[in-house]
């Protein structure tokens, strides 16, 4: 039985490791300067804030963040916004950049190697359970429920899972489970994903969330590092090994998701493409968004820069603009323009006579007068020249910017020949 004392013990004996070193190549130019978990999301957040907030709200206050690729903006964000835990109480967010800590002098060669290279640090913390998390997904989850499920089952490893359309499962690890939720097979990013029996259009996908009994994890990593033919990856190497050698159980997301409406399907998004990133941002501007950011019982924490309030003013002719289904963050100034179904991040400035629809504007973007922007993502610091039109002519958009097959246009300072 999960009594408060029992849950508190699970929290105190758990170490969470957030993997935040991946580039996120499917996001194209958006990750040319920053690692994917550091990408801005929802106006005021970074993607990694969701995994870290889940840890904090779950009562897990011993956290490590593993970094490698272009980590400066991520490290700066963590140092400014996540340094409030009390070290004297045994709480911490440790930063583990690649340091060539083991023999061979190599950087992190995969997700499993990233954890292995810090094994001496992990052992010194002496956790009973280790939660390994991807730092690049958007969701709200009580990890303590998953840890309790792991402890009660007696499994060596517990894998968070969610049902997805079968053809979307090519981007995930896919598993088979028996009637007792035991994982019987695990395939990492299969070209032809197997379906859930009796449901030909649905697959059971890994969420990239694993709970390990600590001693078992140590032995797995030490075995893997001595293996020649390996990618040193949790999905490709570690999980298949657990399935054949030990006991892995599946933990459905529905068992531990956090939602203010139990009738709504559990929200989990891999915003790994420009289309998915754009759509997930715009969903937040809906009248009733799928992801509730206003749940005071499960806040999403972040670094909050001290900015003046957002301001809406009349245009240069004295006419009033309009806006609906908008997220507008601190420091924004909107001058008499028509804006709908969009996300305006911190310090965005929009001049007069603009028409903006279905746009995600990242921090410090300025939009000149008389611009028309449709179905766009504007990267941080871009200055959109007066009279610019984006999103109306697919050929012109593709010649100037990064345009997806679904028609979302990503505008970067480099594409505008600007230096930020």
UniProtKB/Swiss-Prot annotation:
NCBIfam families: glgC (TIGR02091), PRK00725.1 (NF001947), PRK00844.1 (NF002023). The keyword Ion transport does not apply. It catalyses: alpha-D-glucose 1-phosphate + ATP + H(+) = ADP-alpha-D-glucose + diphosphate. Signal peptide: none annotated. InterPro entries: ADP-Glc_PPase, ADP_Glu_pyroP_CS, GlgC_bac, GlmU/GlgC-like_hexapep, NTP_transferase_dom, Nucleotide-diphossugar_trans, Trimer_LpxA-like_sf. CDD domains: ADP_Glucose_PP, LbH_G1P_AT_C. GO terms for biological process: glycogen biosynthetic process. Belongs to the bacterial/plant glucose-1-phosphate adenylyltransferase family. This is Glucose-1-phosphate adenylyltransferase. GO terms for molecular function: ATP binding; glucose-1-phosphate adenylyltransferase activity. It comes from Paraburkholderia phytofirmans (strain DSM 17436 / LMG 22146 / PsJN) (Burkholderia phytofirmans). Pathway: Glycan biosynthesis; glycogen biosynthesis. Involved in the biosynthesis of ADP-glucose, a building block required for the elongation reactions to produce glycogen. Catalyzes the reaction between ATP and alpha-D-glucose 1-phosphate (G1P) to produce pyrophosphate and ADP-Glc. Alpha-D-glucose 1-phosphate binds at residues 108, 173, 188-189, 206. Keywords: ATP-binding, Carbohydrate metabolism, Glycogen biosynthesis, Glycogen metabolism, Nucleotide-binding, Nucleotidyltransferase, Transferase. The keyword Transcription regulation does not apply. Disulfide bonds: none annotated. Its EC number is 2.7.7.27. SUPFAM superfamilies: Nucleotide-diphospho-sugar transferases (SSF53448), Trimeric LpxA-like enzymes (SSF51161). Homotetramer.
